[in-house]
Design a protein with these regions (language model features):
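Membrane-spanning alpha-helical segments of multipass transporters and channels
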Residues: 1-279
Length: 280
């Protein structure tokens, strides 16, 4: 919570009161992408750290029959949900201090988009933590997010992505979040921006901004649904990987041979007892 408030105040100090000129367009885009990037790292990496530390302990306890894999995994998912409250605080502070679209519906869409991104980032972290050793997961996590950042929509135009790498955008939760946030912010027909008049590039309205980044066909609802579908698929994959990790350990099955004491005593006659005592 503390770090989220610090980041929110930092963004507020840098982007506070963005204008409706061309610099304001650039600042809005930069702030939106930084929000996506911050939420990606702050959601995925803690998920990797926490689960990787518990992984071996959980697998051993499951092998001993302490609890089922599904019970642990569901409890882990539920335990991660309260952490979203700090993201609500972060996004609310940034949204109103920076001065994004004041429409309440746009604000609610903004919250929905960032929550879906956080869930997808947590799912990415769970996949890495369950499918890789601890050291590899901690190293591969930031590298994976960096690749997703390149295809997020601001550093590389979606229309210029090579054909062989276009599939990355379909599994890139940062792209889904950033494109949806841009559509939410600049998709308003009343969004207009002033031009400097110095002969440079001018983006007079939100439609021109979306077209520049190849987001003109992007809508919020489909992007949110894609994020939810991606999250569900990644969580299922993480669960399968956890089950496979658990199967490497032989379940502990202690078979105790405990015949009834009364039957043993009844099977021993008094004569047998006396005979054993005479032999002694």
């Amino acid at each position: 919570m503390f770090l989220d408030v610090v980041y929110a105040l930092l963004l507020a100090a840098l982007y506070r009161g963005v204008g409706d000129d061309q610099e304001g367009v650039q600042n809005r885009l930069g702030c939106l992408f930084f929000i996506c990037l911050n939420l990606a790292y702050s959601s995925a990496l803690p998920s990797i750290n926490l689960f990787a530390a518990e992984k071996n302990i959980v697998i051993r306890e499951q092998a001993s029959g302490a609890y089922a894999t599904s019970a642990y995994y569901l409890s882990k998912l539920v335990a991660e949900l309260p952490k979203l409250s700090s993201k609500f605080v972060f996004c609310t502070l940034v949204y109103w201090i920076v001065g994004f679209n004041p429409d309440p519906t746009r604000y609610l869409n903004f919250l929905l988009i960032v929550v879906c991104e956080c869930l997808a980032a947590q799912a990415i972290g769970m996949v890495m933590a369950t499918g890789l050793p601890i050291g590899a997961a901690l190293a591969f996590g930031p590298a994976c997010i960096t690749v997703f950042t390149l295809f997020g929509g601001i550093y590389l135009n979606m229309d210029s992505i090579p054909l062989g790498a276009g599939w990355i955008a379909y599994v890139d939760f940062i792209y889904y979040a950033f494109s949806a946030l841009c559509a939410n912010e600049f998709g308003d027909a009343d969004a207009t921006f002033t031009c400097d008049g110095d002969g440079g590039r001018c983006l007079p309205d939100g439609a021109a901004v979306l077209e520049l980044y190849s987001f003109e066909d992007i809508r919020v609802a489909p992007q949110v649904l894609c994020q939810l579908a991606l999250t569900f698929g990644l969580q299922c994959l993480a669960f399968v990987l956890l089950v496979r990790s658990s199967s490497r350990y032989m379940p502990l099955r202690i078979e105790r041979e405990a015949p009834d004491l009364n039957k043993r005593l009844s099977a021993t006659s008094p004569e047998d007892v006396e005979l054993k005592e005479e032999k002694k």
